[in-house]
A protein has these predicted regions:
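Generic serine detector
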Residues: 9, 13, 24, 73, ...
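Alpha-helical protein-protein interaction elements
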Residues: 14-15, 31, 114, 187, ...
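Acidic/His-rich structured neighborhood in mature extracellular/periplasmic domains
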Residues: 17-174
Length: 262
């Protein structure tokens, strides 16, 4: 409740008036109706989740498989994870052309707000819940590798989702990343961004906003994309299990073992 709506605690004066006002807001009422209508039938998502969680269970035998729910959050957090359950904010997956999105989100945000990515975000949310980030959140390398691990595993679990879709990129942007991977990596190294604990700089690499501080063509979240390439290299070099992949927490050691050469 409180975490979803950004409301005060029930003890605060006027709390219930605030709740009533929130849910009476016309835009939210329309959003709720549209979301319930869009997700009246979810067989496609159930089938994807069945395959995806079966893959996770095969590779993480001790992992508990959560009960999966849906909710309307009013454009708040995409996925909520709690003990043995996950809930997806379906109002964030209405399709990039959904009219209400036009006033609230940029193009680079709307491209991710697709029904086809719902199952992927369930899986990513659960992996993050089961294997929370334990590095230094201000160090780019730590964040890149962690986010890259999540993308790598979700793509293995749901291979029908293309890497470009999983990143929230247009195909042309993904192809640009592939063609410019070496230049991107060299730029990060030359600017000494990889190991320097700088929260502001690190967050720029992981924001959905286009990374124009690197070049005009660089799409957003480029840190995650490069992290994914490092993880792919690590898995080719080490033939590790996915459990070993998630348990390797030392990012510098991981990079060394990956022998990443874009």
């Amino acid at each position: 409740g409180k975490g979803i709506l950004n409301l005060q605690s029930p003890e605060v004066s006027g709390f219930f008036d605030q709740v009533i006002a929130y849910y009476s807001e016309p835009t939210l009422k329309n959003l709720y109706k549209d979301a319930v209508r869009e997700y009246d039938h979810v067989t496609d998502i159930e089938n994807q989740l069945g395959k995806g969680f079966a893959f996770l269970k095969a590779n993480f035998p001790n992992m508990q498989i959560p009960a999966c729910y849906m909710h309307v959050s009013g454009f708040n957090q995409n996925v909520l994870a709690a003990d043995s359950l996950l809930s997806l904010s379906i109002d964030k997956y209405m399709g990039e052309a959904y009219p209400l999105y036009q006033d609230f989100f940029y193009d680079y945000q709307r491209i991710k707000m697709q029904r086809t990515l719902a199952a992927a975000d369930y899986l990513a949310g659960w992996l993050m819940s089961e294997y929370p980030f334990e590095g230094n959140e201000n160090i780019l390398l730590d964040r890149m590798i962690y986010e890259g691990k999540i993308k790598y595993i979700v793509h293995l679990a749901l291979p029908e989702i293309t890497p470009a879709q999983l990143m929230g990129y247009q195909e042309k942007d993904y192809e640009w990343c592939v063609a410019n991977e070496l230049t991107l990596w060299n730029t990060i190294i030359q600017r000494k961004h990889l190991y320097t604990p700088d929260q502001i700089t690190t967050s720029k690499y992981l924001d959905d906003k286009p990374c124009t501080f690197l070049s005009d063509e660089t799409p957003g979240n480029i840190g995650t994309w490069i992290g994914w390439q490092i993880v792919s290299s690590y898995m080719k070099e080490n033939n590790a299990s996915l459990q070993t992949l998630m348990q390797q927490q030392n990012a510098q050691e991981f990079l060394s073992q990956a022998k990443y050469k874009p």
